[in-house]
A protein has these predicted regions:
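N-terminal amphipathic alpha-helix/helix-capping segment at the start of soluble metabolic enzymes
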Residues: 2-36, 74
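Alpha/beta enzyme core
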Residues: 20-24, 38-60, 72-82, 94-118
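Acidic-and-aromatic substrate-binding clefts and catalytic sites of carbohydrate-active enzymes
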Residues: 65-69
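Active-site mouth loops of central-metabolism enzymes
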Residues: 29-42, 64, 88-97
């Protein structure tokens, strides 16, 4: 990121935790900020921004994500699965059937990875 933008974000994000843990079903989230993984220039920038945001819940577009990018990297190489609860999203789906199928695939992937978002 340019000109120390991440550092400014970190400074703004590091405030005293004044809200109780958010409970949604069996999930407990310290942050109310849910951040997506799309639209970043690189995986390194994404990881830096996620860290700076203080989020503990990250969405991943299952249908749009490539297995490997041109550099041979996978998005999962840059996400700390122990730190973040991953939520598969259905961006890019054009029908309800497609969205349900992609959501189920996402759940299976997270279950196989041992991520609590499954």
């Amino acid at each position: 990121m340019q000109n120390g933008m991440a550092e400014r974000i970190v400074d703004n994000a590091r405030t005293e935790q004044s809200q109780p843990v958010l409970k949604v079903g069996s999930f407990e989230l310290a942050s109310r900020l849910v951040v997506g993984t799309g639209k970043y220039a690189s995986y390194a920038e994404m990881a830096e921004c996620l860290d700076a945001s203080g989020t503990d819940c990250v969405t991943v577009a299952v249908r749009r994500e490539r297995l490997l990018n041109t550099a041979g990297e996978n998005i999962l190489d840059h996400l700390d699965l122990a730190r973040y609860t991953l939520l598969p999203n259905t961006a890019g789906c054009f029908s309800a059937d497609d969205a349900v199928r992609v959501a189920r695939l996402g759940r299976e992937l997270l279950r196989d990875l041992g991520n609590k978002g499954s």
